[in-house]
Amino acid sequence: MKKLFLVVTLVLLSVAFLSADVYIKQQTKTGAFMGQPAKDIVQEQWFGNNRIATVTQDNSIVINLAEKKFFMINHKTKTYVEASLPLDMTKLMPEQMAGMMKGMMEGMTVSVQPNGQTKKIMTWNTKGYDVKMNMMGMDMKMVFWATTDVPFDWKKLASLSGELYKAQLRVGEKFVEEFKKIEGYPVASDMEMMGIKITMATVEISEKTPPANLYAPPAGYTKKDKFAMEDMKQ
């Protein structure tokens, strides 16, 4: 399982109930490491009508709270996994990964604390939060910059985002509760892990009509009962 899958998706929080959905576009830059070139990933997030979707070029994760459904969609292989909420990711893992996943989740520690710093990022007034994580003996340090100056109910999003955290980061309730200490929506973050620097920046927050069938697997995609090892490498 790629540990950096953790990195790209550490910023989720709430949904507005509007005729148009909330659209958020973010850019994550990862420095070169272990012979791998630097990466620049664009991620789109959509929130609306009790539905949450996060989309990259290769994958989509959809949470439909009204129908209590979860979808993880692999656009490369044109396959998807469907599950009911509340989500237990270990039940969807390949057998050889389930035990390892459970051990990682149980052994993970996280601490979130306000650091007293403020910063103006684009049009947003933000406050800083220091986040420290340890997973399998690997320390990760992050700084999140969160703002309440957003055109949606960030408190509502924070209360709805737990299942999406679990799906993207493969974590449990303790992790979710700790991240609720962040007041506002994180519009930027800086992270360092094993000498690798990762930065995330929000470049757009707006209201848009979502694409057709955004919150469901595309027609013609094949349903799978569990993730394959290939999915864990995404």
Identify the residue ranges that each predicted region occupies.
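Bacterial N-terminal signal peptides
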Residues: 7-16
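Extended soluble regions of mature proteins
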Residues: 20-234
